[in-house]
From Swiss-Prot:
<feature type="compositionally biased region" description="Polar residues">
    <location>
        <begin position="80"/>
        <end position="107"/>
    </location>
</feature>
<feature type="repeat" description="1-4">
    <location>
        <begin position="129"/>
        <end position="131"/>
    </location>
</feature>
<feature type="region of interest" description="Disordered">
    <location>
        <begin position="225"/>
        <end position="445"/>
    </location>
</feature>
<feature type="compositionally biased region" description="Basic and acidic residues">
    <location>
        <begin position="109"/>
        <end position="120"/>
    </location>
</feature>
<feature type="repeat" description="1-7">
    <location>
        <begin position="138"/>
        <end position="140"/>
    </location>
</feature>
<feature type="region of interest" description="Disordered">
    <location>
        <begin position="56"/>
        <end position="194"/>
    </location>
</feature>
<feature type="repeat" description="2-4">
    <location>
        <begin position="387"/>
        <end position="391"/>
    </location>
</feature>
<feature type="repeat" description="1-11">
    <location>
        <begin position="150"/>
        <end position="152"/>
    </location>
</feature>
<feature type="repeat" description="1-3">
    <location>
        <begin position="126"/>
        <end position="128"/>
    </location>
</feature>
<feature type="repeat" description="1-12">
    <location>
        <begin position="153"/>
        <end position="155"/>
    </location>
</feature>
<feature type="compositionally biased region" description="Basic residues">
    <location>
        <begin position="412"/>
        <end position="443"/>
    </location>
</feature>
<feature type="compositionally biased region" description="Acidic residues">
    <location>
        <begin position="566"/>
        <end position="663"/>
    </location>
</feature>
<feature type="repeat" description="3-5">
    <location>
        <begin position="437"/>
        <end position="441"/>
    </location>
</feature>
<feature type="repeat" description="1-10">
    <location>
        <begin position="147"/>
        <end position="149"/>
    </location>
</feature>
<protein>
    <recommendedName>
        <fullName>Glutamic acid-rich protein</fullName>
    </recommendedName>
</protein>
<keyword id="KW-0461">Malaria</keyword>
<feature type="repeat" description="1-8">
    <location>
        <begin position="141"/>
        <end position="143"/>
    </location>
</feature>
Amino acid sequence: MNVLFLSYNICILFFVVCTLNFSTKCFSNGLLKNQNILNKSFDSITGRLLNETELEKNKDDNSKSETLLKEEKDEKDDVPTTSNDNLKNAHNNNEISSSTDPTNIINVNDKDNENSVDKKKDKKEKKHKKDKKEKKEKKDKKEKKDKKEKKHKKEKKHKKDKKKKENSEVMSLYKTGQHKPKNATEHGEENLDEEMVSEINNNAQGGLLLSSPYQYREQGGCGIISSVHETSNDTKDNDKENISEDKKEDHQQEEMLKTLDKKERKQKEKEMKEQEKIEKKKKKQEEKEKKKQEKERKKQEKKERKQKEKEMKKQKKIEKERKKKEEKEKKKKKHDKENEETMQQPDQTSEETNNEIMVPLPSPLTDVTTPEEHKEGEHKEEEHKEGEHKEGEHKEEEHKEEEHKKEEHKSKEHKSKGKKDKGKKDKGKHKKAKKEKVKKHVVKNVIEDEDKDGVEIINLEDKEACEEQHITVESRPLSQPQCKLIDEPEQLTLMDKSKVEEKNLSIQEQLIGTIGRVNVVPRRDNHKKKMAKIEEAELQKQKHVDKEEDKKEESKEVQEESKEVQEDEEEVEEDEEEEEEEEEEEEEEEEEEEEEEEEEEEEEEDEDEEDEDDAEEDEDDAEEDEDDAEEDDDEEDDDEEDDDEDEDEDEEDEEEEEEEEEESEKKIKRNLRKNAKI
């Protein structure tokens, strides 16, 4: 591993050095090429400009000379008819023509004045035509120049694109490690460094040309036109040499890359195939191990689930049984309590009936009495309340004593009940006496007692007191003799007026009051009968409710049992399905194993058959040898020559046997390969 790591690091360092050298070399070559291209373009442009300017100057001079000569001729012919201005112009033109071409002057004094006008017209037409031709020629020249420049630009672009593609291909090969530089020897790095230094020193002038315009001008740039012609030839020669060298280098690089690419590709393909095979084997082994682990994990999970489910079911059953027991106990307790209450209710009802007394009515509003009488009434009410409070406490104490006696012994209960009944009768008499006292106080309000059904006139305050003590009051209209109005100052005080106004009642309603039917104490027999009927109805209702609850509970229990049975059946079915799936998987695995065993047996049988064939052949050969030996024994004395022939035959037979054995081994190997592929 250490050796591989070191070799890998060395390759990376070598690749980095090669890329740096190549980049510097490409940069220097690019500078030189750009310099040569600039020189070429400058020379071509300057040469074209010089040639065009010289030609145009020559043409302009010739055209001017011709026009001047013709004008002079025309002026000489038309001297008498022209004006002084024409004479001056002719004189100036003669001076110019004499200064340019004095040899081309022609005397025109021999021509006639009649033909002068026609000639002028012809000359004007010719001038016009010439001007048109010159304009067309100039346009054509410009178009040709533009076309040439466009072609030149396209060629430059095409060359640049080619170089970029080549450089990109080379760099891609460097990145993949498929390309090696030319001078990649033991001392390759030193040689490359020396070459780069020499190229940079030789091309220092080129860098100066690109960097500063003044130096380029001093070396024969665009300062003087004559120096351009001198340097143009040298630059062209250098360009040709550089192009030829570049072509050779490119061709060599392409050949080297092709050879290296083929070898490296083959090696990499082999390595990749080997790695793929190794990875496939590893993946197969990992997959097999994962499958085994998953199967084991699933089996363990199933076992754990089953155990947990069984435990949960047991716990649920235990909890249900506990709940049922608790509910039954609660029901029993409830029934016991209800029975005790029913036994105690008739005693309490009898006590309540005896305790039901007319409500202590306060002083009426319509009572026109002295304040002393009013105080006496209030004092009586207070005494009545205190008496009731004492009686209530006395009842509670007696009730506690009765419960205590019941717990001690049942026989004593009957005696205690008799005593209580006697005490209740005495109390009833005492209460009736108090009622009569209260009625006397109430009778003061009565105007005329015509209603004999126990109807009494009650004030609003009396009505409120009755409602506070839960005594029902029925309102009825008063009879006509009772509706006797009394004057307001005689009946009402200031306090009464304020109460009437607060309750939003009319004075007449307050004066008359309201009639209320107070519940008169019923007879004891009727009350007992009513209470007995009520208790029986309540008991029947409770029984009915209990029956319904029992039915509901039974139905719930039946449903729960049915659900449990269904769940058990579903679980059994699921277990059976899981077992079937496991059996199917095991059967499939067994079938696969059997198929593999059958294939192996077939291979073994083929091998055995081949071995048997070989053994039979050997036996046949042995029998033949024995026969030959017997014949030899019989004929030893007769023919010794036959012995030599038999020996030769034996050798041939042995050779044939060896060949057959080799063929049989080859067949066995082939069959094994085929089976392995299958």
